[in-house]
Design a protein with these regions (language model features):
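Short recognition patches in nucleic-acid-associated and regulatory proteins
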Residues: 26-36
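Polybasic, low-complexity binding patches
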Residues: 36-46, 54-101
Length: 101
């Protein structure tokens, strides 16, 4: 597990009825740290989309929607093109993740 994943493992799960990014019904759970990176027991976020292909769930898997834990809150960033996490962290425009809907 790399340093970025370790930081993400510190945050709590985001368990909302609606997708915290777009407000649609949240029908899937997404592992914030991929299971393949050791995130089996890590935090998850409930998101819209079918499987890994559509909605915000698809954007997370295609590396266009990124999450970061600040130590006190989750923030997200949308990028129009797939972007490596390290590069996304350098960009401005991060927004607070909505946990109430």
């Amino acid at each position: 597990m790399n340093e970025y994943d370790k930081a993400l493992m510190q945050g709590p799960s985001i368990d909302t009825v609606c997708c915290p990014f777009c407000g649609r019904l949240a029908s899937n759970a997404h592992h914030i740290v991929p299971r393949s990176h050791g995130g089996h027991d890590g935090p998850t976020v409930r998101v819209c989309g079918m499987g890994n292909a559509s909605g915000c769930h698809g954007l997370l898997h295609s590396h266009q929607l990124h999450l970061r834990w600040t130590g006190s809150e989750w923030q997200y960033l949308y990028t129009p093109e797939p972007t490596k996490y390290e590069k996304a962290l350098e960009k401005g425009g991060w927004k607070h993740v909505k946990t109430d809907c």
